[in-house]
Amino acid sequence: MSLTPVTLASQSSARQMILKNAGVAFEAVSPGVDEDAAKAGLLAEDVTPRDIADALAEMKAVKVSTKRPGLVIGADQTLDLKGRLIDKAGSLDEARARLLELRGTTHKLHSAVVVARDGRPIWRIVESAKLSVRPFSDAWLDRYIERRGEALLWSVGCYELESEGVQLFDKIEGDYFTILGLPLVGLLDFLRLHGALTV
């Protein structure tokens, strides 16, 4: 029996690595969604950061599923600082300002996954994690940015929890895969139920 084909509507290397390491056979494609325009529209309608992650994941999955067979996974993650959506930094100066803004605070990461088939969503999940950033020194921050460089611009919080970025935190509550941007366990259950993984 052949497995249901799976497409990941994402170019995120972190999400691709998570699925690959979990043993999921998939093909990754760019979703071709203008995320900035979509976010701006959703923010204008006072949509919460949690629901923005869900809406963007759905847009990606649905768009790609109109062109690809089988199951299409769309995913998105937002950073929620006291109800305010925080976007990825565009430069190292912005990354420094972002990390200073997060210093000594607690924020949430909302990670959404939507699976679509034939242009319509058929499954979704949004999971959240709470992360408390320690009151690190300016000197530590400068060294961290110097060592990590442009890699910080790929993460919404300007940290890579799977590497040295874990040192930014004094408390983390939530699932590791949710923090990395792909709530995995529920997704794997769904893929098994729909013939994309062997049981």
Curated annotation (Swiss-Prot):
CDD domains: Maf (cd00555). It holds the Pfam family Maf. InterPro entries: ITPase-like_fam, Maf-like. Its EC number is 3.6.1.9. It catalyses: a ribonucleoside 5'-triphosphate + H2O = a ribonucleoside 5'-phosphate + diphosphate + H(+); a 2'-deoxyribonucleoside 5'-triphosphate + H2O = a 2'-deoxyribonucleoside 5'-phosphate + diphosphate + H(+). One of its GO terms (cellular component) is cytoplasm. This is Nucleoside triphosphate pyrophosphatase. It comes from Caulobacter vibrioides (strain ATCC 19089 / CIP 103742 / CB 15). The lineage of its organism: Bacteria, Pseudomonadati, Pseudomonadota, Alphaproteobacteria, Caulobacterales.
